[in-house]
Design a protein with these regions (language model features):
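Short hydrophobic beta-strand element within catalytic cores of glycosyltransferases
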Residues: 274-277
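Donor nucleotide-sugar binding/catalytic pocket of nucleotide-sugar-dependent glycosyltransferases
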Residues: 56, 131-169
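A conserved mid-protein helix/loop that constitutes part of the nucleotide-sugar donor-binding site
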Residues: 16-24, 178, 182-201, 215-222, ...
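Short His-centered aromatic/hydrophobic patch
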Residues: 88-94, 111
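N-terminal strand-loop element at the rim of the active site
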Residues: 5-68, 215
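Aromatic "clamp/platform" in nucleotide-sugar-dependent glycosyltransferases that forms part
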Residues: 238, 257
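Conserved acidic donor-binding segment of nucleotide-sugar-dependent glycosyltransferases
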Residues: 289, 293-300, 309-314
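A conserved, positively charged/aromatic
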Residues: 80, 108-134
């Protein structure tokens, strides 16, 4: 079966990595997977090339994450002509895919984060696409609530799954064990500025490694200097292997202002590294049941206290429980769920239902 994955805007980020990992895992299972994008940064294109994949890009000069671009639709149409199934990631992609795909071809969408519309939401375009989509996978509670408010049928919405990096071939970077690690985009919504403010309040301060890149980097460097913690903070830059930096750390910190889930948090759990994060959106559930320590967002003092307590051994997380939770999000297990969903949509009428992979897994796999 030929599947085409369409991404609105490709940059080094969690949602794009999730789409890439899923596509690679499905190819290992015999699915033909082709990637298309509306717009892409040089780093995004290089990310795909590093995995041996060429990304076919429409070439918009602006991000198409939120845009209804008729030119993108026209560009997509001939490229989707032989597709058996189309999966769009981000509104601009699944809207365009729904317009461009041939009648009768299943079209599904994915939304990884809550919407931050740059202008008024295009309600007409949204509702038209809702009627054309066969399924819409949603990765967090905030995005689900927004979609329902904009008119999506609850039956259209399915819980999305993101796959984490494999931890089987981790090569830990030789660093002090007593360290903190942040891995993710250096963006305001991820809260790295809050982490720097908290670090300045921590007594017997450990070194902090910021693994990632993004538009907030210059601001963060200035902030570290202003706080007098410049010597304690290392800007690592983007890494395709964040697990190598997280492995063996005293804690992985996820100080997000908004987060539908968190690949970084779950990756740290798979590595048996304690996680300190914020009680926001879907991240709250990730950290529940003792799997991590949750504090209020945008509260440097609360974050500093939690880090001190963890460093001093006064607070512990359930590392085994966290590892069990993380095991549900390997590429192969996530691919099984999507493969089952695709097979349902592609099965001829009257041919019977494909085998549900959740019957062979623990029942908790469908819970974030």
């Amino acid at each position: 079966m030929r599947t085409v994955r369409v991404i609105g805007n490709v940059e080094p980020g969690g949602g794009q990595l999730s789409a890439l990992r899923l596509g690679v895992a499905l190819e290992r299972r015999g699915w033909s997977v082709h990637f298309l994008a509306g717009s892409a940064t040089p780093g995004g294109v290089e990310l795909f090339r590093s995995h041996g994949l060429e990304l076919d890009v429409y070439g918009a000069t602006r991000s198409l994450q939120y845009d209804c671009d008729e030119g993108f639709v026209s560009w997509l149409a001939p490229r989707l002509a032989e597709a058996d199934l189309v999966h769009g990631h981000q509104f601009g992609a699944w809207w365009a895919a729904a317009r461009a795909a041939l009648p009768g071809v299943p079209v599904v969408g994915s939304e990884h984060n809550a919407y931050e519309w740059p202008a008024e939401p295009p309600l007409g375009g949204l509702r038209w696409a809702f009627d054309r989509l066969d399924r819409l996978f949603v990765h967090g509670p905030a995005a689900r609530e927004q979609l329902l408010a904009m008119g999506a049928d609850p039956a259209l919405l399915h819980e999305g799954r993101s796959a984490i990096d494999s931890v089987e071939d981790v090569r830990p970077v030789p660093l002090p064990a007593r360290r903190l690690v942040y891995a993710g985009r250096l963006h305001q919504e991820k809260g790295p500025d809050v982490l720097l403010e908290a670090l300045a309040l921590v007594g017997d301060r450990p070194p902090l490694y910021l693994v990632g890149s993004g538009p907030f980097e210059d601001d963060l460097r200035r902030r570290a200097r202003r706080l007098g913690i410049e010597a304690d903070v290392t800007f690592v830059g983007w890494s395709e292997r964040p697990a190598d930096w997280i492995a063996g750390a005293r804690a992985c910190v996820v100080p997000s202002r908004r987060d539908a889930w968190s690949q970084t948090a779950v990756l740290a759990m798979a590595l048996a590294v304690p996680v300190v994060g914020t009680a926001v959106e879907g991240l709250t559930r990730v950290l529940s049941c003792g799997r991590g320590v949750a504090v209020a967002p945008e509260d440097p003092k609360a974050l500093a206290r939690a880090l001190e307590h963890l460093l001093e051994g006064r607070v512990r997380t359930d590392l085994e429980g966290a590892r069990g939770y993380a095991a549900r999000f390997t590429s192969e297990r996530v691919a099984s769920l999507y493969e089952y969903s695709y097979a349902q949509l592609l099965a001829p009428v009257g041919s019977g239902s494909p085998t549900d992979p959740t019957e062979e897994m623990d029942h908790g796999v469908l819970q974030l």
